[in-house]
Amino acid sequence: MDMRRIVILFALVFSITAVAQENETMIVRLAEIEVYPQHLKEYLEFANEVDRLSVEQEPGVICLYPMQSAEDSTKIRILEIYASEEAYQSHLKTDHFQKYKQGTLHMVKDLKLPTMKPLAPETMKLIFKKQR
């Protein structure tokens, strides 16, 4: 095997290892939220604001993407991706998150925060600009 192929092979292995290690530390959640119908409009305003500010202002917040069920508008899902546990903990302490959390406590009927395992972590950089 010539030197050029060895260098290319080494670079490829190094890149794959780096991506795998990076994604091992990432936190991925799919928040499952049910909102009381009478508070839905106000809740959506809070959610959109905190998600926008978090992505704009926090380097460790890769994605906060809110979605609403087409079948039941009171069911909200938020795709949450943080660069690390430290980024997640930092996010919880921000003024905009605290405003959201305290402002919506009475609006939320049910909340689940399951941690997810990405099945194709190598595509993260293709999808999320902040991962590049």
Say what each PLM segment does:
Residues 26-34, 63-92, 130:
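Short, well-ordered beta-strand segments in beta-rich or mixed alpha/beta enzyme
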Residues 6-15:
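Sec-dependent N-terminal signal peptides
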Residues 27-57:
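N-terminal targeting signals for Sec/Tat export/insertion, comprising classic cleavable signal peptides
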Residues 13-14, 47-50, 95, 104-107, ...:
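Alpha-helix boundary/capping residues
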Residues 1-3:
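N-terminal secretory signal peptides that target proteins for export/translocation
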Residues 16-20:
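Sec/Tat signal peptide C-region and signal peptidase I cleavage site
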Residues 53-63, 81-116:
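An amphipathic, aromatic/His-enriched active-site/gating alpha helix that lines ligand/cofactor pockets
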Residues 21-28, 65-72, 101-132:
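Glycine-rich beta-strand-turn "strand-cap" elements at beta-sheet edges
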